[in-house]
């Protein structure tokens, strides 16, 4: 029965179809068919030939197997051949069977192998046995994995599926066809499942992409980090290497800096041997070259000095003059000495490791070879006892005399150079039996001081003052004609004017006071003294030996030793060439100090300088205070007019203005007082206006009452004699007792004025002095306050003025007040003065070898001042309390000054103390026309560089020859000759149409001021003593005006003016 059912199922087409579909589902998933399904399918496709052969395919109803048709025969043959071949699946089964048989045979062989074989072979056989036993498991796993992979690859996208094989119910029966509800539910479920599967696959793909990207980016970041780490490690290595190199160089620099500091300390302490040792250790070729060159210079100088000494000892003057050509060979150091001497020096240098001090030793030994101790002062000195440093100065001058050399006594001002000189003359007279004659040259202002000092200290020495009128000088010449005198004292003008008489005398010593006047070797005075007089020895006295260039230093050395220092060019090359060859444009501090040190050693044997701080430790101190003040509206107006158009409004009644030249001087006049521009017809004796019109006068009006009440006495210095006239008016209006001394004061009156001011109970509160006439050689220790009304371009002039009070004999603290207008040209002058004062510690300025500071620089400085105009005037004006704090010496004085200011403010009802803009006179304003603008443009063309004009010469119009002829002739005064020459030159220039204008530089201004002072001194001698009073501002005849409030006698100006103010 079962067998019948099986046969029935096998013959049922529906069952066969189901079996085929199930087999197809398995095969689509690449799965193995179950055995019963495989048997069913095999029974369907692999029927026996016998079952199939009887039923060939029918070809219609009339089928005949042997019909003879060609096509029919071919089809039959093809069908017969197909039945003889095996199917693909059958071949696969046969192949699989063969593999299984082989595996089975191999397993049998491996299991039957004996166990006594080698271990390696036994291990291989066991591995192969285990692998063959796992073959079925391996095939099954591989089939499942392959099926899943194929399904994922081909069935992930529903659109790519030809048929939903996964929904086939493999072992189940199908539902009835036509059940729409079931089919729809099936479709919905299938769509949902497909959507979920697609979403899951998309999520997995997205995660895979993100994972891949993260992995890639992580690899990139890791590579970047690794690269950065490598770079950082490389940088660290480079930094460590660079730090090591910098540390090494830093140590080298520190070592070099320490060595340089040690060398500089050795230079400052003047330890030459230590410095030379350190210089050799440094191996600095530049320094070594300079030291070698300067050593050669010292060797040559020492040889020349010794040769000059030998020539003088032989007393063969002709031989000395004839050997000038030989002595000029000093310029070439190796040609000065004989060949034998050069060889000796070279061998010594080689033996002593190139001793760089040998030349300096020879130089010093050649000069001060004869030594003489001076332990006490000469008995001829009766006026007092010399101080220890003055005895040392006397011994130094005696050493110069014994060695037959000249020198410079350059002690600081106030240390008694005059007394030391008198002590030298007395010592020579007493110990050397040298009676003279000696010639003393000094500025005209200090001649009475020399006469008084001789009378006080050495009355037994016959000293004559050679000065005065022609008749008086003739009388003096008659008295000294027989040579019965020891000393003749005169000034610079007479040494040239009376040269015909004075050059006939053989002078033993010529002593030049204020010897810095000879810093220009081309001046008439230097030429006259160098060629026209017979002088055995020379001595220069100066408190300011500071020179600004090698040329000025050489001028002094040339005057002292003309046969040794005979060429300025070679002298400059000695110190310029070593550094020029090294190609260095600027010098280091050590090189600069070394040059200065070597120059010091050149001039040291011939120069002696001591400072007050070194020798006078108990001398009261000196304090300089800069008092800055504002300018009045009138001053600011004039200052603006000068800087804008170069002209100012005048009190002429017609509204005209005056064109100005020398703008630097005009700006300084604006800072001092506007009255310096007005004419003589203007009433200047108005007490409130003269104070309120000037900021400096307003400051003085507050300062002077305080100083007088505190018991101080004042020296006031100014460079303008017209300003001193205004100060006289102010002092007279305020009942201050004063004296006055300037270039026009006669020589005999100067001593009287000094004596009146220095008396113990002198009633005079103030002494008015011009900076250049009153700042030289005067002893005014009774004053303890100095007011510099307007600073000089040359700070040494102000220094000279300050030391009139700060000198030996001063018992009080000296306070110096420098008045400066805020924001004006005076601040520039003060700054330049500070720069120049920096030279004092070096003797020669730092810019010695770079002389680029020319007139062009000064012109640019003035151009900057002019362009700035009045923009900075009146800024940061100090308060009254600040001024009181600066002016007071003690706390009690300060509170006294404060109380006086408060009382003054209440009395004035707190009015403004300076003139305001509405109070400025209308005529002071200028109407700027087109012509004025054109003239102003042309006037400032030299400043802006648009026009080039000829520079006006403000020096003396006379040549040296004309000046000397004027000095020798008594018929005509030199000042008149100069004025005639100037008038002639002016006419010539006007006829040629030359109207050139120029702006003076600071050096031109200094020359002009010196010339004015010299003309004052020379012109005053020809004036009559009883002169009628004048009320004029003209300066070509007189340098000051006369006013009714003062007496008219010029000889008693100081007394008369003070007598007129004795009401207080």
From Swiss-Prot:
Which tissues is this protein detected in according to the database? Expressed in embryos, root apical meristem (RAM) and shoot apical meristem (SAM).
Catalytic reactions of this protein: ATP + H2O = ADP + phosphate + H(+)
- Region (Disordered) spans which residues? 924-955, 967-1064
Q: Does Coiled coil appear among the keywords?
A: no
Start and end residues of each Helicase C-terminal domain: 699-866
User: Which EC class is this protein assigned?
Assistant: hydrolase
Pfam families recorded: Helicase_C, SnAC, SNF2-rel_dom
Q: Which residues bind ATP?
A: 411-418
Q: Where is the composition biased (Low complexity)?
A: 1048-1064
**Record EC number:** 3.6.4.12
Q: Listed GO cellular component terms?
A: nucleus
At which positions is motif DEAH box?
A: 513-516
Q: Name one GO biological process term.
A: maintenance of root meristem identity
Gene3D superfamilies named among the record's database cross-references: P-loop containing nucleotide triphosphate hydrolases (3.40.50.300), Tandem AAA-ATPase domain (3.40.50.10810)
Domain named Helicase ATP-binding is located at 398-563
* PROSITE patterns xref list: HELICASE_ATP_BIND_1, HELICASE_CTER
What follows loss of this gene?
Answer: No visible phenotype under normal growth conditions, but double mutant plants chr12 and chr23 are embryonic lethal.
Keywords (alphabetical) are:
ATP-binding, Chromatin regulator, Developmental protein, Growth regulation, Helicase, Hydrolase, Nucleotide-binding, Nucleus
Family assignment from sequence similarity: Belongs to the helicase family.
PANTHER family under this entry? SNF2/RAD54 HELICASE FAMILY
Q: What does this protein do?
A: Probable chromatin-remodeling factor that is functionally redundant with CHR12 in root and shoot stem cell initiation and root apical meristem (RAM) and shoot apical meristem (SAM) maintenance. Can associate with the promoter region of WOX5. May promote seed maturation and repress initiation of germination. May repress plant growth.
Name of protein: Probable ATP-dependent DNA helicase CHR23
